[in-house]
């Protein structure tokens, strides 16, 4: 068994392969905690946090005269002004207009870029670069889990209200003006460090990278400079929650498993690829894998550029006026969550699916059904506990007709029929969790009005009818 297609065929289809995979949530191979994940989460809203992104993403370097043409042919983005020191959230679709994935595209030079993200988007671009005659050279630096040689670059992120003061302290003075999602350079410990400007918690920060041999020198300088500014190192447990709080879909299910036009791609992908090992879990169950696919608009990617030809353009044009899903945050009801934890003391299979803190999702692609008046209106994903909000929250894509802020919906937590036989899923029963719709990204004030009601009697988890 060598290819993804062969693995799918042996499993009885893509859905069966994904639902029986023993793999859990995506791995961030750094220290789980440096202090404790609660303080590490709160640092990105109260002081500053240093996050190590050196290990969990794949880097795909592409250089050559056709570099921009390659990405324009396979991306929904506008590339007319893309050049050195620019960056984009690159989004690729299949021929039906469903999202394969997104990754960050860094303009290293006018004809040299670096595509950084989970492996599936680099896989897709590499396949097309090599198979359709583009005048480019491709170099791949695998994520640490797939890389026995070590990474060629480090990648750090400094974010939070005190981040800019810390970065200017490291730089020895004001940082040259870097526009949002553009790139520049700063100096750290005498080293020239490239930087991308973006932000968390409504405060500016920088993503920093350079040669891997300089990583520990740069890290030590950042930690020393941040000593008086409340800098905290963030570990893998805190990092796994950041995307939900900031309103970013860490990964959609890649829309590559059934498109007949992608048969050659599935034959090219190894059976042990990210796409072949990934898992699907949760209460949102369908026999059609297309029901797990999303469009760019569903995810809030409103920057589709129809003024150029790209894979998926015609399908998206035809679907432009169709009803859409809307990305929201769901704030889970406190008492319903408490009831789930209370059920852990019940005998046998009477307990609910355990909610691991701070990230309770237990599959690479978590999908839980969102219900309104008995009708499924979308799905919830990446449920986490936020110490900043003191709430359990999740991202969700729901029918835009029902996506009003403040509205109440229900999430079905846990899998049907006692759970799948994946080793990470204990036998359990499903529970219904009420949730309030909030903006995405979530705002700090949403917790007002959702405080615990101490007079409310304890009750067992409700189960789906």
Regions found by a protein language model. Name each.
Residues 102-105:
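Short, surface-exposed charged micro-motifs
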